Amino acid sequence: MADEGKSYNEHDDRVSFPQRRKKGRGPFRWKCGVGNRRSGRGGSGIRSSRFEEDDGDVAMNDPQDGPRVRFNPYTTRPNRRRDTWHDRDRIHVTVRRDRAPQERGGAGTSQDGTTKNWFKITIPYGKKYDKMWLLSMIQSKCSVPFNPIEFHYENTRAHFFVENATTASALKAVNYKIQDRENGRISIIINSSAPPYIVQNELKPEQVEQLKLIMSKRYDGSQQALDLKGLRSDPDLVAQNIDVVLNRRGCMAAALRIIEENIPELLSLNLSNNRLYKLDDMSSIVQKAPNLKILNLSGNELKSEWELDKIKGLKLEELWLDRNPMCDTFLDQSTYISTIRERFPKLLRLDGHELPPPIAFDVEAPTMLPPCKGSYFGTENLKSLVLHFLQQYYAIYDSGDRQGLLDAYHDGACCSLSTPSNPQNPVRHNLAKYFNDSRNVKKIKDTTTRFRLLKHTRLNVVAFLNELPKTHHDVNSFVVDISAQTSTLLCFSVNGVFKEVDGKSRDSLRAFTRTFIAVPASNSGLCIVNDELFVRNASPEEIQRAFAMPAPTPSSSPVPTLSQEQQDMLQAFSTQSGMNLEWSQKCLQDNNWDYTRSAQAFTHLKAKGEIPEVAFMK
């Protein structure tokens, strides 16, 4: 932490640690005309665009193999066309095409001395797919189980590694066998590869123990502060010939695991001067050290503020970022502060400089949403009409043969289905059956596809409904709202839950919203002209409430075993409450045929909206 009263350009990089830095390195001392100078950092290195677009194997040399010359992003650097020692101090990228047959793969040696062949799997345009969905779909088509190593996105592609030729051949057979929701075929490209870096750079168990010992020496228990500044140069590590480079995934993972297992209460962490050029491997620190308040990332190679998004779950109060290339990209101090504070709104100090207090809005006060109201029908006549229609409709819909719904639809009827636009894992939740027909306009932008997903005419509509999973709806969960009504048209929606009754998804709970537009039918009923169905996974609360109150068996008359007095009481209670005979009898039986107590129970439950609409269907 900077000493009190120290000027902005004289602060040091201490986070309760004694090392000091040279003066004049503040992030707001720009030269005139100096902006983002990424294109001028050495001419002999391979451009990032080539690295990102090449399908060949990529090998990174050790970032500290060359002489150690401090990189200063705050001074103007001329373009260089020839290799310099400065450039050799940075990470080198070598792109090579492996011309060996795919079956041979790239050889790597595991810690137990066995040799493994590695293959890099590439999915062009894979970035548009959710990771879990993509891997689940590949696994469902692959003839052997596989363990994807180091899954990541690169430009528009998705990549991961597998470690033997048998798995690679099985994945090759999946090429173009997976169809996405837009009916596109997914390509899978297999290339032999060097072992992924997470495997190459794994520390051996004895090395992890030595790292743990060294980290304990660097930990200040009184301040709950861990100093990992320039860890690779630690004398004890160098003496034991242990190479710990925190910009390698395996090394960072080992360090974070030690923190999680030994000092999860950590408040301050110094990672300065470790040549970190990305923070992907550090993202788990949000869970492993949730109390972290002070983080020093100064003197690294972070080029973009977007890297901070990977750790923005931390509730940081102090952050050091000076001497990173990203500091060159800000035009002024206020932009720099506001950009960083977007990620860490509770930040009080940046690069040792006190910040103005954050503007806070009192939004954390608990607010309760008003309780959901019951159905709305407008009039009793409309209520009777709609409830009778829904009772008939879903009796046929859940019967197993939906062909009987033909009479419910107009000749020119139109129907569509949609699902959530970005589900976490559609395969795991078994929503994949609905995806190919989903017409979610937030996801489907192509007008031709949108039109194709509309089902026109009653024959096509019912044929489409017959292809959907077989269901059993919980009519007690229905909430019905009439939103528009004229003499020739009625628009209403119904919300509720259902479960699937066959296949792999048997007993899976779904929630739905269905909007009908109907016109009068010749039989004094309703005829559907437009049907929109939205299906999602039921929430935990909906699952808990689903099918909790089984519907009584329909009956048109009181149970014969009732006495005459009970039958008279039942008829009177049904007339006064408006409930049908089945639900009236249930209420009376639950209250031991005490008419007064039954009436009180009915009034109480109706006021709370706990009596389902089916109870009033006669």
Swiss-Prot record:
Residues in TAP-C domain copies: 564-618
GO biological process, one term: protein transport
Motif Nuclear localization signal, residue range(s) on this chain: 66-99
InterPro entries attached to this UniProt entry: Leu-rich_rpt, LRR_dom_sf, NTF2-like_dom_sf, NTF2_dom, Nuclear_transport_factor_2_euk, Nucleotide-bd_a/b_plait_sf, NXF_fam, RBD_domain_sf
Major site of localization recorded for this protein: nucleus
CDD domains, sorted: NTF2, UBA_TAP-C
Motif (Nuclear export signal): 82-109
Compositional bias of kind Basic and acidic residues: 1-15, 81-102
Segments of this protein annotated with the region Minor non-specific RNA-binding: 2-59
Residue stretches of each LRR repeat: 265-290, 291-314, 315-342, 343-370
Domain spans labelled NTF2: 385-535
Domain RRM: 118-197
Transmembrane segments: none
Pfam family, one: Tap-RNA_bind
Keywords annotated in UniProt: Acetylation, Cytoplasm, Leucine-rich repeat, Methylation, mRNA transport, Nitration, Nuclear pore complex, Nucleus, Protein transport, Repeat, RNA-binding, Translocation, Transport
PROSITE patterns given in the database record: LRR, NTF2_DOMAIN, TAP_C
Modification 3'-nitrotyrosine, positions: Y125
Annotated region described as Disordered, given as residue ranges: 1-113
Family: Belongs to the NXF family.
The protein's role, per its UniProt record: Involved in the nuclear export of mRNA species bearing retroviral constitutive transport elements (CTE) and in the export of mRNA from the nucleus to the cytoplasm (TAP/NFX1 pathway). The NXF1-NXT1 heterodimer is involved in the export of HSP70 mRNA in conjunction with ALYREF/THOC4 and THOC5 components of the TREX complex. ALYREF/THOC4-bound mRNA is thought to be transferred to the NXF1-NXT1 heterodimer for export.
Assembly information from the UniProt record: Heterodimer (via NTF2 domain) with NXT1. The formation of NXF1-NXT1 heterodimers is required for the NXF1-mediated nuclear mRNA export. Forms a complex with RANBP2/NUP358, NXT1 and RANGAP1. Associates with the exon junction complex (EJC). Associates with the transcription/export (TREX) complex. Found in a mRNA complex with UPF3A and UPF3B. Found in a post-splicing complex with RBM8A, UPF1, UPF2, UPF3A, UPF3B and RNPS1.
Record protein name field: Nuclear RNA export factor 1
Originating organism: Rattus norvegicus (Rat)
Recorded name of the encoding gene: Nxf1
